[in-house]
Amino acid sequence: MEITASLVKELRERTGVGMMECKKALSENAGNIDASVEWLRKSGLVKADKKAGRIAAEGRIVVVHDGCKAVLVEINSETDFVAKDSHFLAFAEAVAQAALVAGAADVEALKHVKLPSGETVEETRAAVIAKIGENVRVRRLARIDSANNVAAYVHGGRIGVLVEVKGGDVELARGIAMHVAAMNPPYNKVADVSAEFLEKEKEIELSKMSEKDKSKPADILEKIISGKINKIVKEVTLYGQPYVLNPDQSVEQVVKAAGADVIGFQRMEVGEGIEKIVEDYASEVMKQAGLS
């Protein structure tokens, strides 16, 4: 992965470590910021993430849908209070609309897209930060542009879903989007489940078995394990889960009854994957007072 100047800058801001050390850390960790912070900590170059208190883990998921095109954008703020601010919300909506119209493929491309004001997304972001006094981050972008049925669903501004369905109708596609929002399946179909996941689950199931069960004939043991794995696969695939709008049927049964096929989906939830910092104000006050 190319180590860009923006990645080096972000790591420097978070750790206070020199440019060359940051570049080396990013190179060692394939450009992953969080892994690079941990690498620097293990190397003794930094005791903690200096920008930890400025992590933008709140925010808004915005969906814009126009026929067979739809985009999903996550815009982060530091606090839930700012996530409800009118300036923040206006920025989030403008960014999502611009992403749809411009056809931006990723966040890096989106930064350079111009908004109706004439300023780029990145320039406007800087202005919003100056106005509200919190870090604001355009974190993720997903899009679907297809001749198939495309549905978009957002729940409370915190969860957003895009779904592409071949066949069926718009109502079915929207129902599937609502299901994905509620159940968060990691995979679409059985064929999408990774071999690594299956192997890991097999190891876990074997470790949970008693020595008596493990001593059973290989063919019987394989049937027991396969049964457990099949149950797990149903739980982690969209097609295997009971349909939230009709739990008596699986999603696969509902989709096939409509002569349809779910091509894929995208789901985002505000702040997922971001480690939130819990402040210990009592310890901080004692430290500043020289009592600890």
Curated annotation (Swiss-Prot):
Region annotation Involved in Mg(2+) ion dislocation from EF-Tu: where it falls in the sequence: 79-82
Keywords assigned by UniProt, alphabetized: Cytoplasm, Elongation factor, Protein biosynthesis
User: Could you tell me the superkingdom of the organism this chain comes from?
Assistant: Bacteria
Q: A Pfam family matched by this chain, by name?
A: EF_TS
Q: Which InterPro entries match?
A: EF-Ts_dimer_sf (IPR036402), Transl_elong_EFTs/EF1B (IPR001816), Transl_elong_EFTs/EF1B_dimer (IPR014039), Transl_elong_Ts_CS (IPR018101), UBA-like_sf (IPR009060)
Gene3D superfamilies from the UniProt entry: 1.10.286.20, DNA helicase RuvA subunit, C-terminal domain, Elongation factor Ts, dimerisation domain
| An example molecular function term from Gene Ontology annotations | translation elongation factor activity
Q: Where in the cell is it found?
A: Cytoplasm
Coarse class of the protein's main subcellular location: cytoplasm
- GO cellular-component terms in the record? cytoplasm
Record's family? Belongs to the EF-Ts family.
Q: Explain the purpose of this protein.
A: Associates with the EF-Tu.GDP complex and induces the exchange of GDP to GTP. It remains bound to the aminoacyl-tRNA.EF-Tu.GTP complex up to the GTP hydrolysis stage on the ribosome.
Name of the protein in its database record: Elongation factor Ts
Give the originating organism: Xylella fastidiosa (strain Temecula1 / ATCC 700964)
